[in-house]
């Protein structure tokens, strides 16, 4: 599982997240949880070190 570097959309702090092989990040948002638009997408809730919750939608 490769590690991907993300940035918190609220404070910009670095966040590391493991994604399945071949996965591509489609969106990173703090606004609202976006549901997957296909069977090959998932949405994960992530927190940065400043306790900001945000959502990562990815596809594989």
From Swiss-Prot:
Disruption phenotype: Mutants show various up-regulated and down-regulated genes, including bop and crtB1. GO terms for molecular function: zinc ion binding. The keyword Membrane does not apply. InterPro entries: Brz_Regulator. It comes from the Archaea. Keywords: Activator, Metal-binding, Transcription, Transcription regulation, Zinc, Zinc-finger. The keyword Cell membrane does not apply. A zinc finger (C4-type) spans 8-52. Belongs to the Brz family. Activates transcription of bacteriorhodopsin (bop) and phytoene synthase (crtB1). May interact with DNA or RNA via the zinc finger motif. This is Transcriptional regulator Brz.
